[in-house]
Amino acid sequence: VEKIIESSLLLCALSCILTIFLIILFIITQGMPIILKEGPVDFVTGTTWDPYNDIYNIFPMIVGTFVVTLLSLVIAIPLGLGCAMLIAEIAPHQVRSIIRPAIETLAAIPSVIYGLFGLIVLVPFIRDNVVPFAHDYIGWIPLVGGLVGTQGNGFGVLAGGIILAIMILPTIISISEDSLRAVPRELREGSLAMGATKWQMITGIVTPAALSGIVAGAVLGMGRAIGETMAVLMVCGNSTIIPTSLLSMARPMTSAIALEWNYASGDHQVALFAIGIVLLAVIMILNLVIYLANRKKLNFARM
């Protein structure tokens, strides 16, 4: 009986591996022809996406993807780490019992709901309040004015970054909290015995010791942000021009696939598969970073 169970479990594992391998192989075989036709360098670094004239360069989409993702991380990492510190080190049990279900609920909300919230609430707020404020009070400041921008209709990098930050917060909070809790109790007690305050203990001892896990949470959140489609499609504006400011519109790579697939054919469809290859490569690199960070975390735990 045990042999049958072990064989069944092995078969399940091999089926998962085979499925992933076949999906990757399918996407690569479907998308590689356009990469070879355009040239890998031109495909990735060119700035023109014009399916009607058979020109397929995705650099504006790559920039849009990473700018929106970077903004979401800038917002979500401090908030997520602060919340994780509160739950793991400071808050009493009654407070934790309220915060944790709220975070789990946040993680369970469908992305289209986040998109609707952004479309109905966030985009009009940016258009009616942030854009006029930036135009009147920030636009004249060197560097900062150019970074923020002074023109916009509410759709763009800022809206996408805020929505993605809200979406990846549960991931960053959960993994960071687990990493903070995994730090040996002896380190906490030793630092307090040496006269450190609780805040000094948290920031000077516990957080550095849990850093690899915190980084893994941030990278996992980054992977979630890069792969998100519906929410960013609804609030980013879907412009294929390189975004030059936070108020500029952008089109992340996932949005391009979702928007254009229904009417794409021929080389256009192949180019969308090629975008999928780039996304796969990015996600695989991020997974490798997470694996290495978790290995370091496990090595620390064994010490």
Predicted region positions:
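Periplasmic/extracellular loop-to-transmembrane helix junction in inner-membrane transport proteins
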Residues: 1-3, 7-8, 28-72, 92-93, ...
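N-terminal signal-anchor/first transmembrane alpha helix
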Residues: 1-25
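Hydrophobic positions within alpha-helical transmembrane segments of bacterial inner-membrane proteins
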Residues: 18, 65, 69, 73-81, ...
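Membrane-interfacial helix termini and adjacent extracytoplasmic/periplasmic loops
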Residues: 37-56, 116-166
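Transmembrane-helix boundary motif in ABC transporter permease subunits
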Residues: 72-103, 134, 290-296
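Transmembrane alpha-helices
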Residues: 102-105, 109, 113, 172-176, ...
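C-terminal transmembrane helix and the adjacent membrane-cytosol boundary/short C-terminal tail
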Residues: 177-181, 185, 262-303
